[in-house]
Swiss-Prot record:
Lineage of the organism: Bacteria, Bacillati, Bacillota, Bacilli, Bacillales
Similarity section: Belongs to the UPF0340 family.
Matches recorded under Gene3D superfamilies: Hypothetical protein TT1679
Source species of the chain: Bacillus anthracis
InterPro entries per UniProt: Antibiotic_NAT-like (IPR028345), DUF436 (IPR006340)
Superkingdom classification of source: Bacteria
Identification of the protein by name: UPF0340 protein BA_5559/GBAA_5559/BAS5166
């Protein structure tokens, strides 16, 4: 089995396991950070390839078609971990669009591939995503809503890259007397 085929297979299993647990809904935002260098077993930022980026992008687009989620592709630290998204998403949520074109050496291979293969791509600096996937320890946490909840899948690596995934939940607020699940005794005034 070639490395690319293995990467595709691992990604499919990981996304399927994730969706089974997280149950993402249509319209929710899914952020992806990825080091294609790490996927190939190299140090982050040193050996990114468009071939690996294409394989990962196509699997993520397939996941998007199946679930109706919106994708956000995190750039590397050279672009302050900005994100490539469809213009329609940026306009819908009034995300501020910034001017930069990701390239493999300043943006990363996956974000660059996304920028050249989305319908109408733009780059934004900030987002609060509902869930996400981190391939190669790229640190997507800054782009997740509070509170992040880790999701464990059967896949621990994509290629040679460590993979983590998370969904989010609303904050539990209110202190000692707060109630988080409605029960008969909590909805009556006796």
């Amino acid at each position: 089995m070639t490395e690319i085929v293995k990467v595709r297979e691992q990604l499919q299993i990981s996304l399927s396991d994730f969706q089974e647990q997280a149950s993402l809904q249509s319209g929710q935002i899914f952020v992806v950070g990825c080091s294609t260098s790490e996927v190939l077993g190299e140090r982050i930022g040193t050996s990114g390839t468009m071939e690996v980026a294409e394989a990962i992008f196509s699997e993520l687009k397939q996941f998007q078609e199946q679930t109706g989620i919106e994708l956000a592709f995190q750039c590397c630290e050279h672009l302050n971990r900005a994100l490539v998204v469809e213009r329609e998403l940026a306009m819908k949520y009034q995300f501020e669009i910034v001017t930069v074109t990701p390239v493999r050496s300043a943006g990363g291979a996956l974000a660059t591939y996304a920028y050249h293969n989305l319908k109408d791509p733009v780059v934004i600096e900030f987002i609060k995503a509902d869930a996400g996937m981190d391939i190669g320890d790229t640190f997507i946490g800054m782009h997740l809503k509070h509170v992040a909840v880790p999701v464990r899948t059967s896949v621990k690596e994509i290629g040679s890259a460590h993979v983590t995934m998370a969904t989010t939940r609303g904050k539990l607020i209110g202190g000692a007397r707060a109630v988080y699940a409605a029960k008969e005794e909590t909805i009556t005034c006796r």
